[in-house]
Amino acid sequence: MTPVVATPNEDAATGNTSGYRLDLDGLRGIAIALVAVFHVWFGRVSGGVDVFLTLSGYFFVASLLKHVLATQPASASWGRAINPWPRFWRLVRRLLPALLLVLAFTAALIALVMPTTRWGPLGAELQASALYYQNWHLAFESQDYAAADSANSPMQHLWSMSMQGQFFVLTLLCALALGGLLRALSLKVEFFRRPRVVRGIVGFALLGVALVSFAWANYRHGINQPFTYYDTVARLWEPLAGGLLAVWMPKLALSARLRNLLSLVALGLIITCGWWIAGVQEYPAAWALVPVGATLILIWAGSPATARPAEGQARVSRGLAHPQLVWLGSIAYALYLWHWPLLIFYMAWRYQDEVSWLEGTGILGVSVLIAWLTTKYVEAPLRSGSLRRKKTVARTTDGDAAPDTTIKPTQTDKPGFQNSRGYRGALLAILLVISVAAGSAAVTWQRDAANATLDTENLDPRLYPGGRAFLNGAPVPKVTAQPSPDVVGMDWPITSYDSIISGWKDPSIKVGYYGDVDATRTIALVGGSHAEQWITALNDIGKRHNFRVTTYLKVGCALTTEHVFTWFGQKYYQCNDWSNRVMERLAVDKPDYVFTTSTRPPQGSEKGDNVPKDYKEIFARFRDRGQKVIGIRDNPWSTGKLKPPECLASGRKPEVCGVSRAQAMAPTDPAAALADEFPNMTFLDYTDAMCDDTYCPAVVGNILMWHDYHHLSATFVRSLIPAIEADLQKATGWW
C-alpha cells in the first residue's frame, strides 16, 4: 500500500510545503475501494495497488530528497546526514502496529477455522508477512493472485506490504549513502552543493534503476509471469516512477479546461482498468503503465505547478478532496490489511469460493468498521509516539509513514485516552506479547509440519484394502483412514524424493533406474507427474519379477507434439522440446515397453476424460517404429474448493471431498477405442478401483486416494499393485 502521513506539498522537489494534497488522500480512498470491491466480488486485480505503489514512491522519495538537500550545507552534521535509525524507527512505528494486530488475529482464526493440513504452510506465511518477505515466499510458491476462494491464504494480499517495505529500506539506505557521498564531495567542490545538481543526480539515479526494473519486468513477464507478479525487482519501477515525479515535477502551466480533461481521463483509467486489463497476467509489465501513468497525471494535474495564476485546482482534484473520500483514504492502510483475511476466513467457514452481494457488503462494512477502530486506537497513537506535538503540518513531512495511513494534520493532537503515554505503552506491550505468541505458534506449526512422519508401506492390507475395496469387493473395517490428512501431502512417488524428475524450467532429461536395476528387460516410465505416480507399483513389481524401470519424467509434461500450457496459462515451450528429445532418446535406448498415460481430464466445463490429438500423434510415432506401449488411463481429478486432504481435515465426509464419476471420467476408457488403430498398445484402466458407480470419494478402502487436488497418494497406488501386476503379466508374458 502507500506510505503517507501528513504528506508534503505536491511540489516537494522544489521545497514548497505550503499546501496539503487532500485530493491525493481521496485518490487513496478510491484506490482502496477498488481493491476491496474487486477482491470481494469480481476476482480480478483492480490496479489499485499500483496506484498505492506510485503514491508511495512519490511521497517517500520527496521526503528523502528534502533530507539530502538539507544535509548538504557545511553546517549540517554528519550524524544527521547518514544515520538511518531515526527514519527507520519511524517506518517501524508506522508500519508494524496495525500489521501485527492483523497477523495475531489471523493466527487465531487459522487455528479456529482452517484445517490442520494448512497450519504449517500458513505458519510460514505468518513469518514471511511479519518479516516482510511474503512477496518472495509467494513468488516461489507461484500462487495465483487472480481470485479469492476459501483455499487462498488469508495473508496473500500482504505481498504488496512486503514489497513496499523492501522498497522503503533499500531506498532509504541508498538515499543516505548518496547523500553522504554528495556531502563529502560538496565539502571540497561547491558545485555538488547546488540543489539543482543534487536533484539532477538523484533523478538520474532513480531513472536508471526504474528503467532497469521496467525492462526486467517485461523480460520476465514472458518467462514466468506468476513469479514476476511478486518480484520486487520487477515492481520497483512503479514507486520509482512516483519518485521521479517528486524530483522532476514539470512546471508547465495549463488551462483549467485541459487540467480537468487530463484528470478526468486519468481517473477514468484508474477506475476502469481492472475490467479491461488482466492484471494478474499483465502486471507489472507494460500494461501497468496505465494505472501508474494515470496516477502520475493526477498528481501532476492537481499540482500548483500546472495551474495558471489566479486559477485553483482542477475540478477533478477538488472532487477527490471530498471529505468522505479523504476519510476513506485515512483508513486505507488498515482497510487493506483487514478486508482480505475477513473475506477468506468467511469463505472458509462457509465452505464456498465466492460471496453474494449481501455477504460481500457485510464483509466490507465490518472491514471498514474494524479499519477505523484500528486506525484510531492502534495506528495513530503509536505513530505519534513520543514526538512532541506541533501545530504545523510540516511536523510530518517525512513521507515515510505506513502505507495509506494519512490522517488529517491535527488529528493526533486531539485530547483522548488513546493519545496518552500510558495507553501507548500498554498498547505497545500488548502488541509485542501477541506478536511473540503468534510467532511462536507459527514456528511450532512449521516445526511440526517438518517433523511429521509418513510410514504407510507396511499397512495391513486386511484393514486398508484401498483400491481393492471397489475393484474386488474387499471388506472395509472401521479404522482411521491412512495416511493422515496432515501428512498425506508428503506421500509422493520415490522419484520425487530422489529428484529424478525435471522441473518446469529444467530442460534436461533425467533418467532414473528402479525395479531390478541389473535386469535386461526394461519398461520405460515416460511423461509428467501423472505418469510418475505409477513408479510406486512398477518399482515393487520390477524387483520381484526381474525387470528394470527407467524413468523419463518432467513436471506437467506428458509426451506431446504440440505446445501445451502451464497451469498458470503460459505456453510451456520446454515441454515440447523435452518431449521431442525424449522420443529421440527412446529410439536409441529401445526399452521393451513404454509405460505412459493415455488420456487427459476434462477441461473447463467439459465432462469426462479424452485422448488429445497430440497423444494420438505420439502413439502413431511409437507404432510406426514398432515400439510397444502400455497406456494407462489417467485417474479422476477432484474439483472441490479445497484439496481433498484439507476437505477431510475440516471434518467433511469423503464423498463430499471427492468428485462425481460422470464429471471426471467418460463412461468407458476413451483410449480403449483406439486398440485397432494402435495394435502395438495395451490399455490399462483402474477407474473402477477409484470410483463406485457414481462417485470417486477422497477415501477408498480406508486409504486417502489423493495427496493433493489430483495426484494419487503413493499409499493408494501401492494398494493397486496386485491388479497392476496381473495386467503387466498379461501384457508382457514375462512371468
Predicted region positions:
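Membrane-interface helix/loop caps of multi-pass membrane proteins
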Residues: 2-394, 413, 423-427, 433
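Short coil-to-helix leader/linker segments, especially the first N-terminal amphipathic alpha-helix
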Residues: 1-13, 496-507
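Extracellular/periplasmic envelope-modification machinery, especially enzymes
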Residues: 279, 350-354, 368, 376, ...
